[in-house]
Amino acid sequence: GSVSHMTASILMEAGYKTGLYTSPHLKDFRERIRLNGKMIPKKKIVGFIERHNEFINSLKPSFFEMTVAMAFDFFAEAKTEIAVIETGLGGRLDSTNIITPVLSVITNIGHDHMDLLGDTLQKIACEKAGIIKEKIPVVIGETSPELQDIFISKASESKSEIKFAERNFRCFLDNFDPVAGERGFHIRELNTGRTFIGTIPMGGDCQARNLQTLFQAFQILKNIFKVTDNHIIAGIRNTVRNTGLQGRWQVLGREPLIISDTGHNKEGIEFTIRQILKISRRKLHFVIGFVNDKDLGSVLPLFPADAEYYFAKASVQRALDSEILMNEASKYNLKGRAFPDVKTALDKALSCSSPEDIIFVGGSTFIVAEVV
């Protein structure tokens, strides 16, 4: 999500009429489909359904398939100059994969959607490699020795130029400033020694690898679009303002420090907790909840026992019951109370906190959606 939003923001800074399709949404369905940062108008959604109602009823596409079709229809009608399209899950069989892009980007491989993509990172990598198209360049953001051969093989088979961002760029992040709500970075192009300096409004440590991926992508996109280094730096700095991105290490309060993040797979949660533990504060409070198909055994051991827990249930059908979560968490020495909803859990965390404490809200996108 972050890379998609930053890419769109940069292209907007360069003056292009830019479409952006991402998922899921946090508050409003229309967040998924944006043109120059503005959400699709409600009348366009209604118009699409009315025009295609008969076809939709006969074909019965999935919710995601219908939203992808709606996005493409909207972008075509608006004569969008370029669209940034984020896959839903995997890649090979994803409905976004019907397009032929000018560039494919695979940010990283994590333990996500394992019931659909496969139970090993190798299987997941094979699915994600499915977005590599014939003679279309591809950027790999983060990989490992056991996975890179999968991408190299697929790129070779497709006659596609392949670039590994972490081989060509190195990003260093300054300490996160919760007051300013942003973070300084400098990124070095390894083969030339050139350095780029700027600020990013998303404070997570994971943004270092995202920035490496982004700079690698624009090294290629600069050959297609009129994008300067200044556009890139400004686009990164203005991502939240330009595209409305939320829930990425988002500061919701400062005394106590309240941070929310949508990271929900093992890798994302691990990154987030590691960063939280580096912050010098008195006490930690976690307001967390998960979806009911989450492999709790892979994520609960990542949380520190030396913290207070407020187990919450998001107001969606897929949400895991907070009592069940509390009982499972106790197996990993995570102690706390269960709450029927996110607001009650957060209110309790606030009442139990001092100004020097940290409250983290997360575990699933649905939990974060109720606090941002």
PLM feature segments, named:
Residues 2-6:
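Hydrophobic positions on the alpha1 helix immediately C-terminal to the Walker A/P-loop
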Residues 13-99, 115-117, 145-146:
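ATP-dependent carboxylate-amine ligase catalytic core
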Residues 21-23, 141-142, 156-177, 200-205, ...:
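Beta-strand->loop->alpha-helix junctions that form or flank phosphate-binding loops
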Residues 24, 70-116, 148-195:
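Extended acidic/charged loop-beta regions that coordinate divalent cations
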Residues 77, 82-87, 95-105, 110-114, ...:
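Nucleotide phosphate-binding/pyrophosphate-handling subdomain across enzymes
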Residues 125-134:
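Membrane-proximal helix-turn-helix segments that form the acceptor-binding/catalytic region
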Residues 144-154, 159-163, 257-260, 266, ...:
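C-terminal helical cap/extension that packs against the catalytic core
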Residues 364:
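Active-site-proximal loop/hinge segments that shape catalytic or ion-binding/gating pockets
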